[in-house]
Amino acid sequence: MKKLSILLIAGAMAVACSNGKHAEFEKNTEAAKAYFKLHETENAEEMFTYLSDDLTWHMPGYGMGIGGIEEVKAAILGYQAGFDNMVFTADYWLPGVDTETGVPDGSTRVYGTWTSVYVETGQELSLTSYHSFEFKDGKIINGGDWFDLGGMMNSLVPAPVEVIETETME
């Protein structure tokens, strides 16, 4: 009986702990959704209030590595200057896990698609992406963007114009 009681108590504690992390995941997911909505409305200054000063962020471009808050702010401003009608459509939001233990930690991640219009040419764009968000004290402290930034930018370059040389008769 004593062993059964211990098992029941341990099980109840495990459920209580996981429910707490699930509530944290739900809260953080809502914050990440709000952050993306601000990106859609091009409200960079309000987006910046979601970011911790100690932010570390996986940047999406080849060779960019890990950026800090200034690099992320510059990227946000660049996207908002270069693209109109930005809309993120999530396929699904998933709970994140502690990278060392594999235990849910309240972080959130999402797979989805960004659509927008490139300002310079009016070209419509659709970009599949993955984003992760870790929070500390209600602010985004760590995470990243994973998508084909180079491919996206290459798709926006106009196709070369073929020049046909003709002979002139004099």
Kindly give the residue locations of the regions a language model identified.
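Sec-dependent N-terminal signal peptides
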Residues: 4-14
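C-terminal and inter-domain tail/linker signature
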Residues: 17-170
